């Protein structure tokens, strides 16, 4: 199972290169949610500005996310943006729910709220940015595992992978790895 947590694009011509890079992964069952850099082009930023804790506005230079979405769907991947899915991968029954990027308030948890199917072997929560206000709702609904991206293992790190900032609401010790 391939789980894509977003921020795939950086340029208006990037879809073919993105699909080429994903290559053989597209033949596997997959799920995706989008990050801001699927919708709008990234902009240069001094990463030390993250230390100020201010959220910056996206560029609002549109990226071709619809074409990427269509290609993902054509390859059989499931769009988990504001959606729930139930399916099997091999013999494993999955219950999946996802939201659009909460870092820029594109999520609407009410559209997917509620516990996962109890018959599922594994329940997955997907979101681009691991914002606590959304993670807490997934946990309260009983999802077993949440997968997200956005933090890049810490936007600025000291040696030993010690993050100085996360660029989201989670604490610095949780920017990478597996956590209970």
Question: Model-flagged regions — what are they?
Answer:
Residues 76, 93, 142-146:
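Glycine-enriched alpha-helix->loop->beta-strand junction motifs that scaffold or abut catalytic
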Residues 22-27, 116-119, 138-142:
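Short, conserved loop/helix-junction motifs that constitute active-site signature segments
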Residues 1-88:
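Core catalytic region of metal-dependent phosphoesterases/phosphodiesterases
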Residues 2, 28, 121-123, 144:
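Conserved acidic residues
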Residues 101-106, 110-118:
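Active-site-proximal loop/helix segment associated with metal-binding centers of metalloenzymes
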Residues 130-180:
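Conserved beta-sheet core of the metallophosphoesterase superfamily
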Residues 77-78, 84-96, 118-122, 180:
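Beta-strand-turn-beta hairpins that frame and shape the catalytic cleft
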Residues 1, 93-102, 124-128:
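Active-site-proximal beta-strand elements of phosphoester/diester hydrolases
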